[in-house]
Amino acid sequence: MRLIVVSGHSGAGKSIALRVLEDLGYYCVDNLPVNLLDAFVHSIADSKQNVAVSIDIRNIPKKLKELTGTLEQLKTELDVTVLFLDANKETLLKRYSETRRIHPLSLGGQSLSLDQAIEREKEILTPLKAHADLILNSSGQSLHELSETVRMRVEGRDRKGLVMVFESFGFKYGLPSDADYVFDVRFLPNPHWEPALRPLTGLDAPIAAFLEQHQSVLSLKYQIESFIETWLPLLEKNNRSYLTVAIGCTGGKHRSVYLTQQIGEYFADKGHQVQIRHTSLEKNAKE
């Protein structure tokens, strides 16, 4: 039996993630009280049914160690993944404004504004986020995009083995929150300053030809591949579900996209489970 515990910020997409898991055949329970988690899991352990439960801020005990302790104990007995849904404040404010729903922490006697409730929830959930096996940032994603992201990550994990995620990004949009390793490639020659190349992306052949003229680009590509190859056996031995490698340049359009695609394909050709994402390209395509 596999257990996925879904948690994260209110408005970040926990309900969407749970619906995706239900479509994938998981038996899903929404907002299960933490003190019932251990008993519930053991009551259905013999069914061999994969299970997903969501836990939100209303059900998290004041002493968070009660939850993290339960999760750590379950991990010694079962295949447990803690999925944490994250999003930036701007996205959460926009979603609450669109749905006109009240934040859970604004209910009751606390009388917190939406902004205060989001900040307070972030503070409470930080230790749980540190225990997460998989963090998905839904900032700027549509319902369909988030559903596909959850589906890809879960289906990749169900095939067993480490899933390698390579994502390009632009530093001007901020660091990705789910990265295990971040490589800054802003020091490499920039095709942006070539007028004929500026409209293209790192997926286009002229950009590849430009970058491959420079030994610094080829050397960095080789060194990143070698670094990952060196430590990959130990990462796999550590029973990790995912390894997320983020490569960033200024705008996330040329250098980072080229290197992310090339390095991702390198490991895919070696038989690894690989997912490649170009976050800034996807962001700009929607605008």
Curated annotation (Swiss-Prot):
One of its GO terms (molecular function) is ATP binding. The keyword Heme does not apply. Keywords: ATP-binding, GTP-binding, Nucleotide-binding. InterPro entries: P-loop_NTPase, RapZ-like, RapZ-like_N, RapZ_C. The keyword Transcription does not apply. ATP binds at residues 8-15. GTP binds at residues 56-59. It comes from the Bacteria. Belongs to the RapZ-like family. PANTHER family: RNASE ADAPTER PROTEIN RAPZ. Displays ATPase and GTPase activities. This is Nucleotide-binding protein VP2673. It comes from Vibrio parahaemolyticus serotype O3:K6 (strain RIMD 2210633). The lineage of its organism: Bacteria, Pseudomonadati, Pseudomonadota, Gammaproteobacteria, Vibrionales.
